[in-house]
Structure formats: structure tokens, C-alpha cells
Amino acid sequence: MENKNEAEIFEIIAHGGNAKSLAYEALNSATEGNFEEAKKFLDESEQEMAEAHKTQTRLIQDEINGEKIDTSLLMIHAQDHLMTALSEKSLIEKMIELYKKLEEK
């Protein structure tokens, strides 16, 4: 059985994965003291996160409006990708703040 929301699910997975990868690129830049580049990567990560969230919100609104949204293992995987990306990005932002403080000393 094919999931009719498969394209949207893969959008969430792709954008969530991109967001997480970009956040780690930001962390790598910060560890080298390149905070301008780190900010650029975090901004790009935020854009990817926004795209994933937009797709997620659209699916939620469709379900609220009575459309049947299949809860598949693939959908759960997409939500997991997005949640971990959000969580890790938040932690990475705090780590970058710490690197900045260490650099100032």
C-alpha cells in the first residue's frame, strides 16, 4: 500500500537531515574559531528547519480538516528526524555560545 503523503514525508526527512548536518557544520566552524561561518551555517540550518516545519504543519492542518493521514513507520521516522534535528540544533547553539566565551578569555 502506497502512502499518499510519501512526498511530504520525504520532504520532512530531507529538510530535517539537512538542518542537522548544517548545525554540525556550524559546530565544526565554531571549534575552529570561525564564528561568522558558524552563524552562516546556523542560518541555513534554520531555513531547512522552517521548510520541514512548514510541511509538517501542512500535514497537521490537513488532518485537522478531516483528511486521513496515514501513520506509517516512514511518518514516524520523519517526525523522529525533525525532533532530533531541533534538539541537536538547540544544543549546538549553546555549545557555540560556550566556544565564543572560551575564545574571549
Q: Where do the protein language model's features map onto the residues?
A:
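Terminal alpha-helical segments
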Residues: 1-105
